[in-house]
């Protein structure tokens, strides 16, 4: 604790208990999201740990027909690890599947290659959620690759500071040249 130095252990079970206590509609399993690395062995160990935590999270979650429990696919930029992670999660059984460990330093091309490599293996009848992605080009590219859901602080942060995204690029809507502009932002740039 930052208050008194007391140690707290956040286990997969405790994470589920907290999220249920918050009355979350979608509950996420605990996972380990390693830095963007090319170290296959490190990514594999992290993926295996995340799969074990997903199993424990599912047991802790129990059956709840009014809430959704999402598994988080890990595996870095390695297609075989992503597919193995996804298959582990499918075997456990979840209401939806999130893709974690992307948008953490890799290029957009690398992110799209991961999505292209896994999209045909993801259950079509379940929601597909790409975590931490919020730029318009990332969202559009991910939707083309079968992703349904996104979350990111960037759109809110951008809007709060007056940054608007248009088909012609970003504009700072608070600039004086837009003071009397009556055009939609998509026409303003």
Each language-model region and where it sits:
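Conserved small/polar residues in nucleotide/adenosyl-binding loops
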Residues: 184-189
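Glycine-rich phosphate/ribose-binding loops and adjacent secondary-structure elements
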Residues: 60, 64-181
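Active-site entrance/lid segments in N-terminal catalytic domains of soluble metabolic enzymes
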Residues: 1-94, 104
């Amino acid at each position: 604790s930052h208050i008194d130095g007391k140690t707290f252990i956040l286990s997969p079970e405790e994470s589920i208990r907290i999220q249920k206590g918050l009355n979350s509609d979608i509950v996420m399993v605990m996972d380990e999201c390693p830095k963007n690395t090319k170290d296959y062995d490190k990514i594999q160990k992290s993926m295996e740990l995340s799969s074990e935590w997903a199993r424990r999270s599912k047991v802790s979650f129990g059956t709840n027909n009014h809430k959704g429990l999402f598994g988080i696919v890990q595996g870095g930029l390695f297609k075989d690890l992503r597919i193995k992670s996804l298959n582990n999660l499918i075997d456990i059984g979840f209401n939806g599947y999130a893709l974690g460990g992307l948008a953490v330093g890799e290029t957009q091309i690398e992110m799209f290659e991961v999505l292209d490599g896994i999209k045909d293996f993801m259950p079509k009848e379940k929601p597909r959620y790409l975590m931490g992605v919020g730029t318009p080009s990332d969202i559009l590219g991910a939707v083309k690759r079968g992703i349904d859901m996104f979350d990111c602080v960037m759109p809110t942060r951008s809007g709060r500071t007056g940054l608007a995204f248009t088909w012609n690029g970003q504009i700072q809507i608070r600039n004086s040249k837009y003071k009397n502009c009556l055009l939609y932002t998509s026409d303003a740039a």
